[in-house]
Amino acid sequence: MNKIANTEVEINIFNLLKKLWKKKFLITFVAIAFATAGLFYSLFIVTPQYTSSTRIYVINPNTPNNSITAQDLQAGSFLANDYKEIITSTDVLEKVISSEKLNYPSSQLLQKITVSILKDTRVISISVEDANPKMSQKLANSVREAAVSKIKAVTQVEDITTLEKGNLPKAPSSPNIKKNVLIGFIVGAGLSTIVLVIMGILDDRVNTEEDIEKVLGLTSLGIVPDLNKL
């Protein structure tokens, strides 16, 4: 009994695959349509964003000159996480807003800033994203300067080195056009396939001679031809 049931399931899956294959051009068309929508969205709807990055290096205040150990590096890594919180603090953000005369709140500025710490180092990277490439560079440097001042005031650290100043981005960092087009293509192909599979599962019409024998349990004696096709 299980063998028969398994056979029927296999036949149903095979029939679904046959139906999908017959609709391959429709699936491709829908996928291309969604990919085109992703391209249109990337080029004409979403505003391109530019990212400028600056990096600083912070020395552990308890480390004597020229005597950095592995423990110092580990401690410095933990301190770097503290510095990360200081960089994104309201005081730093408000100072940047004041110095750059920005007309939006600190919460909006915070959304533009990404602070990352290179693994097992005390190097802190500050990235700022903005629709204007020059503004992203200006904000990155302003955030760095305000953050360095705040870190010195809070932790009594004096040795903070600027490894890199904010660069002027020449190309947008987002949107990722290739990624959006690929996502659109995959979503289009996936949705059209799912819809066709559901339609195939719900389709209980008798279409073939085999369907008649399966549903009624009777042997077919013959087929009446369609007169319109004669």
UniProtKB/Swiss-Prot annotation:
Which GO CC annotations does the UniProt entry carry?
Answer: plasma membrane
- Identify the pathway: Capsule biogenesis; capsule polysaccharide biosynthesis
Q: Which InterPro entries match?
A: Bact_polysacc_biosynth/exp, LPS_length_determ_N_term
Q: Name one GO molecular function term.
A: protein tyrosine kinase activity
What happens after mutating residue 115 to I?
A: In strain: CNTC 1/82
Q: How does the record classify its membrane topology?
A: Multi-pass membrane protein
**Biological processes, Gene Ontology terms:** capsule polysaccharide biosynthetic process
Residue spans crossing the bilayer = 25-45, 181-201
Looking at the record's lineage, which domain of life comes first?
Bacteria
> Where does it reside?
Cell membrane
Q: Enumerate the UniProt keywords alphabetically.
A: Capsule biogenesis/degradation, Cell membrane, Exopolysaccharide synthesis, Membrane, Transmembrane, Transmembrane helix
What family does the database annotate?
Belongs to the CpsC/CapA family.
Q: What does this protein do?
A: Required for CpsD phosphorylation. Involved in the regulation of capsular polysaccharide biosynthesis. May be part of a complex that directs the coordinated polymerization and export to the cell surface of the capsular polysaccharide.
Protein name per its UniProtKB record: Capsular polysaccharide biosynthesis protein CpsC
What species is given as this protein's source? Answer: Streptococcus agalactiae
The encoding gene is cpsC
